[in-house]
């Protein structure tokens, strides 16, 4: 099935979900936003709704109220959100997976492993625009539950061009459940590169949380330090729902603070926050 047909199916499913969306957004669907991504399944076998819903309750401590299940869909309400899981009996477009795999440093074997998936479970979490952190937490737990219930290789977040392998993803999700540690690497892509002896990097995914992306350019620091600084800055923004102002300092790498300034993007499009690092 081609991409056009896939989005047609998802559109029809979204119509079915309209009443649930209204509930999740405080009866005002105009204020809702969707977190979406795909679990890459190894086999063309629909999900077992009964088993999955039970695992979400017992293993992941998620309330699954008002559950409505079909042959290929599972829809239920959780506190502050509505979740839909749609089984699609065809893979994510190979071109998408190939492009994401080429930049995937977290999943070094993604080109070979992710491309072998046969089907996908598309997970959508609908929540109010001001609750994106909670929506991403829910998404992560649901995705990890699907990963543990089925033979699957990983998760693909299409809005971030992000591929995350199964082992890393489930470990991060359990750490979120047990320790409330935010799995930022499962939500935001961190690109790094070195040119002419200088290091640089950028985030791609902060837009999901209503924030501008961040960049570091022409840094004399090592690549791993650039990535660590970007990670700490992204964590600060997501964790605190922080609204950054020009010239503000934000904490990174322990007690160190870095000044951020808004300017034209170096690696991305539009304007980004530059970390003076």
Residue locations for each model-derived region?
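Aromatic/basic-lined ligand-recognition segments
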Residues: 161-249, 254-277
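N-terminal low-complexity, intrinsically disordered segments
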Residues: 43-111
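Structural alpha-beta junctions
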Residues: 58-65, 142-156, 236-244
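Bacterial N-terminal signal peptides that target proteins for export
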Residues: 2-11
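Bacterial N-terminal signal peptides
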Residues: 10-19
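Short glycine-/aliphatic-rich beta-strand segments at the starts of folded cytosolic domains
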Residues: 33-41
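Internal, hydrophobic cores of structured domains that mediate oligomerization or house catalytic pockets
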Residues: 90-183
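Boundary at the C-terminal end of the N-terminal hydrophobic targeting segment
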Residues: 22-26
């Amino acid at each position: 099935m081609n991409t056009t047909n896939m989005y047609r199916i998802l559109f029809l499913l979204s119509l079915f979900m309209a009443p649930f969306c209204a509930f999740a957004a405080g009866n005002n669907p105009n204020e809702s936003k969707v977190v979406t991504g795909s679990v890459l399944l190894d086999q063309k076998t629909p999900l077992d709704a009964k088993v999955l819903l039970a695992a979400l309750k017992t293993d992941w401590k998620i309330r699954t109220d008002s559950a409505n299940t079909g042959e290929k869909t599972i829809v239920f309400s959780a506190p502050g959100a509505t979740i839909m899981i749609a089984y699609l009996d065809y893979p994510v477009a190979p071109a998408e997976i190939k492009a994401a795999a080429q930049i995937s440093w977290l999943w070094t074997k993604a080109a070979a492993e992710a491309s072998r998936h046969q089907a996908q479970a598309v997970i959508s979490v609908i929540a109010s625009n001001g609750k994106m952190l909670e929506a991403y937490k829910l998404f992560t737990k649901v995705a990890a539950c699907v990963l543990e219930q089925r033979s699957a290789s990983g998760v693909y977040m299409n809005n971030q061009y992000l591929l995350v392998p199964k082992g890393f993803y489930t470990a991060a999700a359990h750490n979120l459940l047990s320790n409330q540690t935010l799995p930022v690497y499962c939500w935001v892509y961190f690109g790094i590169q070195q040119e002419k002896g200088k290091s640089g990097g950028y985030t791609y995914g902060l837009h999901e949380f209503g924030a501008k992306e961040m960049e570091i350019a022409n840094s004399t620091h090592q690549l791993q330090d650039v990535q660590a600084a970007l990670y700490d800055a992204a964590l600060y923004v997501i964790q605190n729902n922080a609204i950054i102002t020009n010239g503000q300092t934000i904490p990174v790498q322990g007690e160190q603070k870095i000044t951020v300034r808004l300017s034209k993007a170096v690696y991305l499009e539009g304007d980004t926050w530059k970390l003076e690092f």
